[in-house]
A protein has these predicted regions:
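Active-site His/acidic residue clusters
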Residues: 249-269, 315
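Phosphate/diphosphate-binding loops
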Residues: 274
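Histidine-centered active-site/metal-ligand motif
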Residues: 246
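Non-catalytic accessory regions flanking glycosidase/transglycosidase catalytic cores in CAZymes
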Residues: 1-242, 278-279, 283-311, 315-500
């Protein structure tokens, strides 16, 4: 029997709700068709936003949405996306499929979407091909309430009051598609550009996000922090509130990646092993951040994460459309448990991407919509949002097929909500073994337990023909004991228990 020990009274760090954030890019069917269908569409919508998608995202309590990219951000010129839609400039989306971008979804539409979702806004600015003035004017257009050229332009375009801008990314992947810069050059550009990302509302300031590393480029993290911190007052923390990190699971590597649906046991464990590498990245980048920011004033912002496979057969390679199986449910559960466990440093994360792209929570086909296994994991984990991480540990054993890609059989994280409920989330990575869990809750009287679970065979998925193949089901097989609870977690599953 496996032992899980939980100390509800030993609170460690707040699990920011923003850890459960999402990412939407102008990557063909993510924004267009997936979220925005236009006011004249036969698909039910409110001001052009699909009502089915909006309601589904509200259900999982989407806390924050990042936009417009991604690589698209550093070629996006925001003034092309305001004003009458019939006069907006068209452009070629050179990064994603070479298709025409008509800019019908722009700043006003994004903030309309955030208002419908009830979520915070994370805008990524253009440092790669844009000017300091362009970035400065965008922030002014969005947030300034008084009399100014940009505020007047916003009012002329139909929005009298400014919007609340919570997060602003000063460039994206500037080590790659955002300009192929070296870390010192980018850091100095960051210092210049961020100066003009002005906080016009001290009562709700903009949180500035600096472009961080790709995967394990620890030199980038070190050099960017060194340059930004050596040229400003210590208490300003490099003039940043967050430092980003991007990491994707590519089962077979960057060039081949591998199929989203056709994989064997070896690739299953290899994929989960790569998902677990997120913890190593957080710890090693976090150690460098600790040198310059021991008080953890700068949040680690994992604003692109998830599984990235070879696109579905017959689809445009530049649209990054892929299916979603129980493997993705496990990747999501594993990763979110890691984020929770490191919530002292990880302050926001954004799954890539929200609809129809990469490890999305929703897939659409015309008027039809399905919820992916990943969606259902976010649905179960939503109770961790803004709860307090508590001390917990679980006994594990090593499993797998190939020696190089071994994994622990279980992962977990536990939080206590404001109402006192204890929320336990566990993943069983095994393809063939259930585990009986003896759970000890120290100094805690268990009165009631509710459970829910997502589980199935590794290839199970939701399709437009079978949209409910994978879904959240009640889990009632929990026994109360003198020391806590006892239950058995099935193979290939993600489980949530609420204990009161």
């Amino acid at each position: 029997m496996t032992k899980l020990v939980i100390n509800p009274s030993k609170k460690q760090s707040k699990i920011n709700k923003e850890i459960y954030g999402h990412f939407s890019e102008h990557l063909r069917r993510c924004i267009y068709e997936g979220i925005y269908v236009g006011e004249d569409s036969q698909i039910p919508n409110k001001n052009g936003m699909r009502t089915d998608v909006v309601e589904a995202l509200k259900h999982i309590r989407i806390p924050v949405l990042r936009w417009p990219g991604g690589c698209f951000a550093d070629e996006y010129h925001w003034k092309d996306g305001i004003g009458p839609k019939e006069t907006r400039k068209k452009m070629i989306n050179t990064h994603w499929g070479g298709v025409v971008e008509d800019n019908s979804f722009g700043t006003h539409e994004f903030f309309e979407l955030c208002e419908q979702l009830g979520c915070e806004a994370y805008v990524n600015g253009n440092l790669g091909s844009g000017t300091v003035q362009e970035m400065s004017e965008w922030v002014e257009y969005i947030t300034f309430e008084g009399v100014s050229p940009m505020a007047d332009l916003r009012k002329k375009n139909g929005h009298e009051k400014p919007w609340k801008l919570d997060f602003f990314g000063v460039g994206n992947e500037n080590w790659g598609c955002g300009g192929n810069m070296n870390p010192d050059f980018y850091a100095n550009e960051y210092r210049r550009y961020q100066t003009y990302v002005r906080n016009y509302h001290p009562d709700h300031p903009i949180h500035k996000v600096c472009c961080g590393a790709n995967v394990d480029d620890y030199e980038w993290t070190f050099e960017v922090l060194k340059t930004t911190h050596n040229h400003c007052l210590k208490e300003l923390h490099g003039n940043m509130d967050g430092l980003s990190l991007h990491y994707y699971v590519h089962p077979e590597g960057w060039e081949i990646k591998g199929s989203a649906t056709d994989f064997d046991d070896k690739v299953w464990y290899k994929s989960l092993n790569k998902a677990l590498f997120m913890e190593t990245l957080i710890e090693r980048h976090g150690h460098i951040m600790d040198e310059y920011d021991p008080e953890k004033k700068i949040g680690m912002i994992v604003d692109e994460w998830g599984a990235w496979y070879t696109v579905e057969p017959g689809t445009n390679p530049g649209f990054l459309y892929q299916q979603n199986t129980m493997r993705d449910a496990l990747i999501a559960g594993i990763t979110l448990n890691i984020f929770n466990k490191h919530s002292d440093r990880v302050k926001m994360a954004n799954l890539a991407q929200i609809v129809n792209v990469l490890q999305s929570v929703i897939l659409t086909d015309g008027a039809d919509m399905i919820l992916t296994p990943t969606y259902h994991v976010f649905d179960m984990y939503k109770y961790h949002q803004d709860a307090m991480l508590v001390d917990s540990s679980i006994e594990t054993e090593t499993i797998g097929v190939e020696e190089e890609w071994q994994v622990p059989n279980l992962t977990e994280s536990v939080s206590v909500a404001e109402d006192g409920a204890v929320h336990i989330t566990l993943t069983n990575l095994s393809l063939d073994k259930d585990y009986e869990i003896r759970t000890i809750l120290t100094d805690y009287q268990v009165n009631e337990v509710k459970g829910e679970i997502v589980h199935g065979e590794m290839h199970e998925m939701n399709t437009f023909e079978t949209p409910d193949q994978v879904r959240v089901k009640e889990f009632n097989e929990v026994e109360k004991t003198a020391e806590g609870i006892r239950f058995t977690i099935p193979k290939c599953s993600v489980l949530h228990l609420e204990v009161r």
